[in-house]
């Protein structure tokens, strides 16, 4: 890159802040040191709240080494940053820290959170939701990885719930020799549903996927090679699957 281009980046540099996630059980951090290095290399200033990366195994020293500045408080991060990058949506405690014109880049999931929507409107924040960012081909590159994780984790959680010690029926998803495996129904054949099916079928469960698209079901048949069954999603088929299944996973966006 030419010196002229480097200068142009610095002229439009931004102050980017990464506060520590405070939603219960959330251990992730929005930027890794690699991401910080990329932003700093383009002339941006990155402010990271102290210990923001600890839950992900990243130390303050790791961030400092690539050019970030560490803030002792979340208030400073929110106050000094033109753009805030988070993992999860802001919670009520964070609403007062948002200010007019500030860019908030994170998962927002506004459809299920009217109070947050109202707070963003009242604070006049520029909210960019990860889950709505689209590629040129209509794909959702920031939502897809989370859907992959959710799909696989749903099977893991289902196995846990099926254990007798957790109030379940005492079933092993894969079964054992002489005992049939559990029947798993997955409603929705998108990214999350496919990943759930991969794990459940790989463990030996009998898997059925329901979807409303015939083209999607043909695609599922192609990738699973008869390892799962597919059904058109209808009220009757859903009722039948619910009555026969030990584990049902909802995977509809």
Feature annotation, model-predicted:
Residues 3-13:
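Short, Lys/Arg-enriched N-terminal segments with co-localized hydrophobic residues
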Residues 12-13, 18-119, 123:
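An N-terminal-biased, well-structured beta-alpha scaffold segment characteristic
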Residues 15, 21, 90-183:
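Glycine/serine-rich phosphate-binding loop and adjoining beta1-alpha1 elements at the start
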Residues 19-58, 167-253:
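Glycine-rich phosphate/diphosphate-binding loop of Rossmann-like nucleotide-binding domains
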Residues 49-50, 73-74, 107-109, 129-134, ...:
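Short beta->alpha connector loops at strand-helix junctions that form conserved
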Residues 63-67, 144-148, 225-229:
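Short, hinge-like loop/turn segments at secondary-structure boundaries
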Residues 65-71, 86-88, 164-170, 228-234:
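Short gly/ser/thr-rich secondary-structure transition/capping motifs
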Residues 81-82, 124, 225, 246:
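Residue-level detector of structured alpha->beta connecting loops
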């Amino acid at each position: 890159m030419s010196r002229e281009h480097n200068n142009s980046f610095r002229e439009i540099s931004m102050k980017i802040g990464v506060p520590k996630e405070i939603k219960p059980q959330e251990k992730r951090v929005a930027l890794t040191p690699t991401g910080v290095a990329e932003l700093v290399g383009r002339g941006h200033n990155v402010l990271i709240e102290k210990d923001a990366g600890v839950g992900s195994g990243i130390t303050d020293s790791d961030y400092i080494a690539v050019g970030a500045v560490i803030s002792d408080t979340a208030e400073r991060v929110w106050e000094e940053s033109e753009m805030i990058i988070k993992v999860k949506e802001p919670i009520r405690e964070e609403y007062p820290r948002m200010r007019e014109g500030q860019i908030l880049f994170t998962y927002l999931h506004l459809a299920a959170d009217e109070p947050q929507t109202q707070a963003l409107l009242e604070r006049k924040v520029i909210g960019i939701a990860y889950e709505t960012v689209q590629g040129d081909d209509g794909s959702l590159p920031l939502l897809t990885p989370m859907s992959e994780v959710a799909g696989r984790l749903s099977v893991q959680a289902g196995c846990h719930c099926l254990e007798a010690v957790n109030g379940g029926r005492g079933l092993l998803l894969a079964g054992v020799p002489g005992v049939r495996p559990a029947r798993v129904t997955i409603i929705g054949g998108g990214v999350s549903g496919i990943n759930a099916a991969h794990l459940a079928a790989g463990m030996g469960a009998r898997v059925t996927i329901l979807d409303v698209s015939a083209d999607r079901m043909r695609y599922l048949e192609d990738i699973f090679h008869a390892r799962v069954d597919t059904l058109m999603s209808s009220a009757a088929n859903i009722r039948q699957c619910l009555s026969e299944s030990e584990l049902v996973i909802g995977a509809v966006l």
